[in-house]
């Protein structure tokens, strides 16, 4: 029993203490001694409503191991009246997973009651990395109930991308209706972005990741594009600064290659921000 949960008082006693500011009503039948934070209230509801589990953005934060925030979103097979800090949706068919000490609806189900922005942030973070697509496939196979909007959101996100610049370019290419893969393997080498239909491979480098300080990385950075080119792929390579300052050029060049209308900008030093005075400071 949570120490802040109010028990053993009559309705009249509770009403009196609410008026005095000693008790706070959180939801129908759920009162606490004073204010509680979102984590505390989630624990109380887990005890008092065993049929209810975390849902929506609350569940997404739980999956990511983040601090919970109000309002708490829950799902239940039963009807529960929520409150200012608690929102409950009723699901006739409810599947849940135990994650980081709490019960949550399946991650892809939780997306259905989260905002598009929160859902996009979650997908980008939760399914990042080279095994992101594999983990997403597993979760898709294990999720029985998912809305069309959720499927559309998943299709629009850069699943498996490792960095923000990669996600920006993948999102832009998907908006142009290209089928794009991230962390795609060609000849044993992994490429940040690939458009398989048009055999276009893209690598987006940070400032330090592909430095030539080590001979192994130096050699790989040469033989990797050689291998892709020998297999008939068009290879593009950009820096994170190219995406930051000239994303339109990056996207136009990739799209142009896919559409058969190559985009050929002037020589780099005539337009790239980093070639201007003070460019390396921003």
PLM feature spans:
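Short gly/ser-rich loop at a beta-strand->alpha-helix junction or flexible surface loop bordering the NTP-binding
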Residues: 1-146, 259-282
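Surface segments flanking catalytic/ligand-binding clefts of nucleic-acid enzymes
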Residues: 130-282
């Amino acid at each position: 029993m949570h120490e802040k949960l109010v028990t053993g008082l009559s309705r009249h006693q509770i009403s009196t203490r609410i008026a005095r500011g000693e008790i706070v009503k959180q939801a129908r039948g759920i009162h606490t001694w004073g204010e509680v934070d979102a984590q505390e209230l989630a624990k109380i509801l887990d005890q008092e409503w065993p049929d209810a589990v975390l849902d929506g953005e609350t569940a997404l934060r739980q999956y990511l191991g983040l601090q919970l925030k109000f309002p708490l979103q829950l799902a239940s097979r039963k009807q529960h009246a929520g409150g200012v800090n608690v929102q409950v949706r009723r699901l006739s068919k409810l599947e849940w997973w135990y994650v980081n000490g709490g019960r949550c609806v399946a991650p892809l189900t939780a997306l259905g009651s989260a905002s598009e922005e929160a859902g996009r942030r979650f997908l980008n973070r939760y399914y990042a990395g080279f095994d992101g697509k594999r983990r997403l496939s597993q979760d898709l196979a294990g999720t029985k109930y998912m809305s069309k909007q959720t499927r559309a959101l998943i299709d629009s996100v850069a699943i498996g991308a490792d960095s923000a610049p990669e996600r920006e370019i993948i999102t832009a290419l998907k908006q142009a209706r290209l089928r794009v893969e991230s962390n795609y393997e060609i000849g044993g080498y992994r490429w940040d972005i690939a458009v398989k239909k048009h055999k276009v491979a893209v690598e987006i480098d940070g400032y330090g990741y592909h430095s030539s300080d080590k001979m192994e990385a130096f050699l790989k950075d040469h033989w990797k594009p050689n291998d892709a080119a020998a297999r008939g792929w068009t290879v593009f390579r950009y820096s994170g600064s190219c995406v930051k300052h000239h994303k339109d050029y990056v996207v136009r060049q990739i799209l142009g290659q896919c559409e058969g209308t190559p985009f050929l900008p002037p020589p780099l030093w005539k337009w790239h921000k980093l070639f201007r005075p003070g460019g390396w400071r921003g």
